[in-house]
């Protein structure tokens, strides 16, 4: 990657965004950091600079389209032309629908869906005239398969998927060299489960299996540099959720009705008075990880296979070819066997003539 690559990451202060910042910083990118929390943004800035990169801190709410557009303009002025824009910022409410308010649904939608729209429009403003650039969306298995207790977030991710599909189709129609892709994530060990608003009786947790945010960061880095693929799936659980729902949606409804509540909670009563980030950021630098390190996986073999598809297919082809060659060698008669066969054939012919 060339040193001048300019990357914008929303939700950069913590979780997946923070892990993605670290991944791009490791490769020498100049990174514009967008989020609301100033503590986390400053922590991310220090990490970028420690890795030898350049960081531009832009504290703002992605639900504000004017602020996002102004931020993109500033990135172009101070860092240079935007090469990659990653839409990651999100918020959620853990709650049964019957306990939520319309205002809570609106807020989750504004950040988790319209925040992606605002980021995309700001990026396109600069990318389309020069006919280059890449926009990457952080998707989710929940963009295909909704679960109980996260209706607002699931609906926002479904909306994001619909928006993305329209965007990609229009870019293809226009024969644009601006690329876009989406990366669907599994359950991740991020701080969101300790700061998103919750109305659950017990503490919220990601539905196992849980993956570390670095898995997501590596996937987003790869997708940003290989954006021609329509979708990427991270984790076997993501693949199962998406395709299982396509095959048997009614079964999935009943299964999640039985299992989906306990799977999203763990021991310990939730504090109803703890601060949440629905409207304001939670103070402090929370980094990339949540509290589930002891239960989290640091690798996704499914994504590795998907992102190295040519290597996998080549390996399969070589294995099949080698097996066929060995089979041919093992079943092919030796020189001695061929000579003996000719002798037997000649002898049989002589016997028939004599007879």
Residue ranges and their predicted role:
Residues 60-70, 102:
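The beta1-alpha1 cofactor-binding region of Rossmann-like NAD(H)/NADP(H)-dependent oxidoreductases
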Residues 13-14:
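Conserved glycine-rich cofactor-binding loop
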């Amino acid at each position: 990657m060339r040193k001048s690559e300019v990357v914008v990451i929303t939700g950069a202060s913590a979780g997946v965004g923070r892990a993605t910042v670290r991944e791009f910083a490791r490769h020498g990118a100049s990174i514009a950091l967008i989020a609301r929390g100033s503590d986390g943004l400053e922590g991310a800035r220090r990490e970028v600079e420690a890795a030898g990169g350049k960081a531009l801190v832009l504290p703002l709410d992605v639900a504000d389209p004017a602020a996002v557009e102004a931020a993109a303009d500033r990135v172009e002025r101070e860092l240079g032309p935007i090469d990659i824009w990653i839409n990651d910022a999100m918020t959620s409410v853990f709650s049964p629908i019957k306990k939520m308010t319309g205002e809570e649904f609106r807020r989750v939608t504004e950040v988790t869906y319209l925040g992606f729209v605002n980021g995309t429009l700001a990026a396109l403003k600069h990318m389309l005239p020069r006919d280059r650039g890449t926009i990457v969306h952080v998707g989710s298995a929940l963009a295909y398969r909704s679960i109980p207790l996260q209706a607002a977030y699931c609906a926002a991710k479904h909306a994001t998927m619909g928006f993305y599909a329209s965007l990609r189709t229009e870019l293809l129609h226009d024969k644009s060299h601006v690329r876009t892709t989406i990366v669907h994530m599994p359950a991740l060990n991020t701080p969101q489960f300790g700061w998103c608003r919750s109305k659950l009786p017990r503490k919220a947790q990601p539905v196992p299996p849980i993956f570390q945010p670095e898995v997501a960061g590596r996937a987003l880095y790869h997708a940003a540099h290989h954006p021609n693929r329509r979708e990427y799936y991270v984790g076997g659980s993501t693949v199962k959720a998406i395709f299982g729902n396509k095959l048997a949606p009614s079964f999935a409804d009943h299964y999640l009705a039985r299992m989906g509540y306990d799977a999203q909670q763990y021991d310990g009563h939730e504090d109803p008075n703890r601060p949440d980030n629905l409207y304001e950021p939670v103070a402090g630098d929370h980094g990339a990880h949540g509290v589930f390190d002891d239960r989290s996986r640091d690798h996704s073999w499914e994504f590795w296979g998907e992102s190295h598809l040519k290597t996998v297919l080549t390996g399969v082809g070589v294995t099949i070819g080698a097996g066929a060659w060995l089979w041919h060698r093992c079943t092919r008669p030796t020189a001695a066997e061929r000579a003996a066969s000719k002798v037997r054939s000649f002898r049989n012919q002589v016997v028939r003539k004599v007879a």
